[in-house]
Amino acid sequence: MKIKGNKKGFTLVELLAVIVVLAIIMIIAIPAVVESMNNAKKGSFKIYAQRALGNAESTFQSEDLLGTLPTDKNDDNRKKIGDNCYCYTLAGIGLTSSGNFKGYVTVSLDDKREATYRVTLTDNSYSTKGSTYTDLNTSSNIADGSGGITSSCASATCSTSTPSTTEQAGN
């Protein structure tokens, strides 16, 4: 039997070398891709929390101007939870298609009737409790996990701490 001198194809060693190179690339690339995906999820959560604060601010200011602020402590979507303190669920501020998001926004008024907006929110991957606009810019205020947060204003309380001017203005 005569062997032809023009062989075509790859040897087993060449194929194994390619597989090893691809494995090394995957080992290096996968953690970076996973970290990028997690950062994107956290960024999306932060944007949704800011949207909730914005919607609550708009809803509260409209109701305040129209004289229709919540007076009922039994309405769970928008309720008065204390003197100069109000709570709005996500549904109460128009975020009805919220998917996995659960939470609420509290609005507290100081003696000058300047409002402070604080969001308590989870999507079961991340959570934040009582955060203002400024707090959301600090990654330490966004935790992993649900934090036991519900969609109900039943456990909502108003903070007595004095926020900075930017927090009061919602910037």
Predicted regions and their residues:
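Sec-dependent signal peptide cleavage junction
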Residues: 30-45
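N-terminal secretory signal peptides that target proteins for export/translocation
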Residues: 1-5
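Membrane-proximal N-terminal amphipathic helix
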Residues: 41-66
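N-terminal single-pass transmembrane signal-anchor helix
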Residues: 7-34
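Extracellular/periplasmic head regions of type IV pilus-like filament subunits
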Residues: 64-132, 142-143, 158, 170
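Short, low-complexity, Pro/Ser/Thr/Gly-rich segments in the mature regions of secreted, periplasmic
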Residues: 140-171
